[in-house]
From Swiss-Prot:
<comment type="similarity">
    <text>Belongs to the HypE family.</text>
</comment>
<dbReference type="InterPro" id="IPR011854">
    <property type="entry name" value="HypE"/>
</dbReference>
<comment type="pathway">
    <text>Protein modification; [NiFe] hydrogenase maturation.</text>
</comment>
<feature type="modified residue" description="S-carbamoylcysteine">
    <location>
        <position position="351"/>
    </location>
</feature>
<dbReference type="InterPro" id="IPR010918">
    <property type="entry name" value="PurM-like_C_dom"/>
</dbReference>
<keyword id="KW-0614">Plasmid</keyword>
<comment type="function">
    <text>Involved in the maturation of [NiFe] hydrogenases. Along with HypF, it catalyzes the synthesis of the CN ligands of the active site iron of [NiFe]-hydrogenases. HypE catalyzes the ATP-dependent dehydration of the carboxamido group attached to its C-terminal cysteine to a cyano group.</text>
</comment>
<dbReference type="GO" id="GO:0051604">
    <property type="term" value="P:protein maturation"/>
</dbReference>
<feature type="modified residue" description="S-cyanocysteine">
    <location>
        <position position="351"/>
    </location>
</feature>
<keyword id="KW-0456">Lyase</keyword>
<dbReference type="InterPro" id="IPR036676">
    <property type="entry name" value="PurM-like_C_sf"/>
</dbReference>
<dbReference type="InterPro" id="IPR036921">
    <property type="entry name" value="PurM-like_N_sf"/>
</dbReference>
<protein>
    <recommendedName>
        <fullName>Carbamoyl dehydratase HypE</fullName>
        <ecNumber>4.2.1.-</ecNumber>
    </recommendedName>
</protein>
<dbReference type="InterPro" id="IPR016188">
    <property type="entry name" value="PurM-like_N"/>
</dbReference>
<dbReference type="Pfam" id="PF00586">
    <property type="entry name" value="AIRS"/>
</dbReference>
<dbReference type="Pfam" id="PF02769">
    <property type="entry name" value="AIRS_C"/>
</dbReference>
<dbReference type="GO" id="GO:0016829">
    <property type="term" value="F:lyase activity"/>
</dbReference>
Length: 351
């Protein structure tokens, strides 16, 4: 994404009523104008202003780097609490942060469909720029391509993030040990229900908004108190249940959860009951699961609750020895049930 091309455009982009056409992806004057007047204008920073096809930056000597990439195809593009733009920033920042890393830079790639309104694209790009600024993680390079009408769905966005892990931090999905505590940063299911309600034009007494948010500051606050956190994961597609099954399998352990301890907003619980969904399998975009030694659980929970994104944090269970790697849950009625892997796709195109 070159930031300094000046081609003497005859007229500015018609943002109000203009649309993407094939020329915007052809690499010529129209493409350069789109990049300059829409993308660079929103993402403006020292790397983009260099006008190169890549971003060059220094990294701390001896640093352990983390890289993550995430493709976003959410439908609808705009939903209560966010849009594909802010979601694409938050999602990749969170993937980097779940290694305990400080996110430093983002790259963004756009697949645009011919005929997509420039006004909607501008809204998405400005939302991305705002999310990146708020997180303090600049978008330093990128790319755009255009596909023919009918061969895309408006816009798809892929973001890639780079970060650095502080010395002494070792977080890994294989790190859970029997006796460890399982902590959750907040309520489950808002993002998935917000997407579904918008997609299906469902109305509830209280609007359900996506929880989409960047979690790296919360992670930094947690690690400042308990640097020995063993596992971090954000329960996105497949929800909490799928995430915990992944960790159990990676670590070779089992888990026992307490259903009464898992927070779900009443309106989300009601919506899930109406729609035949289980909140434990519904996607989140601004929550995390942490696993730590039981002796550190109280201190870590206090650190989480001291951050705006962790005020509703709870201790929800424990890690146990189990060669089957089952995730089980004590129900509110006193029984036990297996919380299995998600079978199939519960909510398609959720992120």
């Amino acid at each position: 994404m070159s930031g300094t091309v000046k081609l003497g455009y005859q007229r500015p982009l018609n943002i109000k009523s203009g649309r993407i056409d094939m020329g915007h992806g052809a690499g010529g004057r129209a493409a350069a104008q789109l990049i300059q007047e829409l993308f660079v204008a929103a993402f403006d920073n020292e790397w983009l202003r260099q006008g190169n096809d890549q971003a060059a930056f220094a990294m701390p000597a001896g640093a352990r780097m983390v890289m993550a990439t995430d493709a976003h195809v959410v439908s609808p593009l705009f939903f209560p609490g966010g849009d594909i733009g802010s979601l694409s920033v938050h999602g990749t920042i969170n993937d980097v942060a779940m290694a305990g890393a400080k996110p430093l830079y983002l790259a963004a790639s756009f697949i645009l469909e011919e005929g997509f309104p420039l006004a909607d694209l501008k809204r998405i790009v400005e939302s991305m720029a705002g999310a990146a600024r708020e997180a303090g993680v600049p978008i330093v390079t990128g790319d755009t391509k255009v596909v023919e009408q009918g061969k895309g769905d408006g816009v798809f966005i892929t973001t890639t993030g780079v970060g650095v892990v502080p010395a002494g931090i070792l977080i890994d999905g294989a790190g859970a040990r029997p006796g460890d505590a399982i902590l959750l940063s907040g309520t489950m299911g808002e993002h998935g229900v917000a997407i579904l309600s918008k997609r299906e034009s469902l109305e509830f007494d209280t609007e359900i908004r996506s929880d989409s948010a960047a979690l790296h500051d919360l992670v930094a606050q947690m690690l400042a108190v308990v640097p020995g956190v063993r596992v971090l994961r954000d329960p996105t597609r497949g929800g909490l249940a799928t995430t915990l099954n992944e960790i159990s399998s990676q670590s070779g352990v089992g888990m026992v959860l307490d259903e009464a301890a898992i927070p779900v907003l009443p309106q989300v619980d009601a919506a899930c009951e109406l729609l035949g969904l289980d909140p434990l399998y519904v996607a989140n975009e601004g929550k995390l699961v942490a696993i730590c030694a039981a002796a550190d659980a109280d201190a870590l929970l206090a650190a989480m609750r001291g951050h705006p994104l962790g005020r509703e944090a709870r201790r929800i269970g424990e890690v146990i020895e189990d060669g089957r790697h089952f995730v089980q849950m004590r129900t509110k009625f006193g029984g036990m049930r297996v919380v299995d892997w998600l079978s199939g796709e519960q909510l398609p195109r959720i992120c």
